[in-house]
Design a protein with these regions (language model features):
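Structural signature of transmembrane alpha-helices in multi-pass secondary transporters
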Residues: 4-18, 45, 93, 126, ...
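Helix-loop-helix hairpin linking two adjacent transmembrane segments in secondary transporters
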Residues: 6-51
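C-terminal membrane-cytosol helix-exit motif in multi-pass small-molecule transporters
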Residues: 40-59, 255-259
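Juxtamembrane intracellular "pre-TM" segments in multi-pass secondary transporters
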Residues: 56-87
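Helix-to-loop junctions at the C-terminal end of transmembrane segments
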Residues: 133-147
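C-terminal transmembrane helical hairpin of 12-TM major facilitator-type secondary transporters
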Residues: 150-193
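A late C-terminal transmembrane helix in Major Facilitator Superfamily
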Residues: 199-235, 245
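Intrinsic disorder in cytosolic terminal tails and internal cytosolic loops
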Residues: 259-277
Length: 277
């Protein structure tokens, strides 16, 4: 869980820095320079991987069997209902964040008339709560069990986002309200995604790479669906985005409780203090 929290920290830095950096590039060199910057950073990444990232697994420990072994691993994972439930829980949570990624600029800039710089700061604040909460996943998991953390955080996230949706449906439409609820909600989401990934991988250590690939693919597929649904109902306000986020949060909560309903007690993923991460 500590390792997953660290990975979430690394992966979450980009959503915080990218809008701020993008607004600065746009203001100084125009929007075309953003794409040139992306291309340049991509080339730097390719060179760094080729030059500075050696293979870490010894030859004897590397997976063998080629395509057949890979397909067999996918078959085993896709037949594991517990794995699928946890993967879908995390994917629904990630989908809610993708809906925010896609719709927040239209809502905060076009609807609430924030400047690009103000939008970048608002986005960073909400993403920061996700990162900070993710760093507590391991500690809370050791104290309460990761299954309890997932159930509680998913429920709190759903309640927070559904409350925000009800306020919008009641006609209360304020940017301060949106930012505040997202700040709290994404804190809970920061507990859900790392914990579900750890629980899903726990029983599949021998095929962790395949399982991780499925988890990542599920998050992006669910995210693309959430973006498409939110975009289909765009009306110039923040309501479609908020409704999509709330729906994803509610679905994640339902899946979490269904997937973990028969599993109680402390989480066995990290029963020993000196378990390697």
């Amino acid at each position: 869980a500590r390792l997953m929290s660290l990975l979430m920290l690394v992966f979450s830095v980009a959503p915080i820095l990218a809008p701020i950096a993008g607004s600065l590039v746009d203001e100084t060199a125009g929007w075309r320079a953003i794409f040139w910057s992306i291309a340049g950073l991509t080339m730097v990444g390719i060179v760094m991987v080729a030059v500075t990232l050696p293979e870490t697994r010894p030859p004897a420990a590397r997976a063998a069997g080629g395509l057949g072994a890979a397909l067999s691993g996918y078959r085993i994972l896709l037949s594991d209902r517990a794995f699928l439930g946890l993967m879908a829980t995390g994917a629904c949570g990630a989908a809610s964040f993708h809906a925010y990624l896609a719709g927040s600029s239209f809502a905060l800039i076009n609807h609430y008339h924030l400047t690009p710089r103000q939008y970048s700061l608002a986005f960073a604040v909400n993403a920061m709560s996700f990162i900070l909460a993710a760093q507590w996943t391991a500690r809370l998991g050791l104290r309460f069990g990761l299954r309890s953390v997932v159930r509680g955080a998913a429920l709190a996230y759903a309640v927070t986002m559904l409350s925000l949706l009800l306020l919008y449906l009641a006609g209360i439409d304020r940017v301060e309200l949106l930012i505040a609820f997202l700040l709290v909600g994404y804190g809970f989401l920061g507990l859900v995604i790392p914990a579900t990934s750890v629980l899903a991988l726990d029983a599949h250590g021998a095929r962790a790479g395949t399982a991780s690939a499925l988890i990542g693919t599920g998050q992006f597929v669910f995210g693309a669906c959430a973006i498409a649904i939110s975009g289909r109902f765009t009306d110039g306000t923040a309501r479609p985005m908020v409704a999509t986020i709330a729906a994803c949060a509610a679905l994640a909560c339902a899946l979490a409780w269904l997937s973990l309903r028969d599993r109680t007690g402390r989480q066995p993923v990290a029963p020993a203090a000196n378990r390697p991460v």
